[in-house]
């Protein structure tokens, strides 16, 4: 059987011509073919399509097709598209999050100061996991942005960078930002505090355990277990976490129990044993695990009783805790 060799160059030349065809249906099929072959030589044509195609649906498709490519012109085209029609800018914003090359991401840093809040937020989101040091200063400035989404994305950048100079601003946001999601993000970012900085963020985290939004309290309970490992801080953190075991939301109690176990707080024995009888199985399971981590044999009787819990996960956690304490 004789196979006729395919002229790849000719095929790509035809594909490039079809990307600029007057018929939108032809251009759409060409875009689909590009997604299959992913030939780098076609990137300029796709970028041009993103910039100039009259059909916003196709511009959005072009943005999706460019996701993950770190070519400079592609990054610029996607960033420019953040000012396009809603469906295009959304596709471009998502495509930018797939950047993997920090060098390509550096082309975006100056756009964090754009006057459009959507652009600022999208660029900060794209920069987050790239961990570009140059993004720290504009992200810190963006903590004061009027738009809550921008502030939240700025916190994400600073958290991924583990940018210690931002801790005081993050502590203030954790307590006083008007938006609950921003407060929650700031509380989580305070977990980046190193041991020598933990004392400075502890008051903000304890205050966050009394936040009006239960999601913020939940995040605070988790973060306290991470940063309060040092003995001088542990007593303060554990006292606040024991109070959180009375929270109206079992989700907050669950995280508090987890942190109390992590901090091995023997004074938490009564509240953890009480949690073994809570209606939420997930909390009962976490309380059993925490009691095993605390390591106090006074919990053996309660854990033995919990080994007959109707929830199999609680039974398993309780039996493992009993083995650990025996």
For every predicted segment, state its role.
Residues 1-60, 64, 68, 308, ...:
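N-terminal alpha-helical scaffold/docking segments in eukaryotic complex subunits
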Residues 6-18, 39-52, 71-83, 101-113, ...:
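Amphipathic alpha-helical scaffolding segments comprising HEAT/armadillo-like alpha-solenoid repeats
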Residues 22-23, 54-55, 84-86, 115-116, ...:
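Short inter-helical turns and helix N-cap capping residues of alpha-solenoid HEAT/ARM repeat scaffolds
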Residues 87, 117, 122, 148-149, ...:
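Core solenoid repeat modules with strong leucine/isoleucine-rich periodicity
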Residues 250, 254-317:
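Ankyrin-repeat and related helical/solenoid repeat scaffolds used for protein-protein interactions
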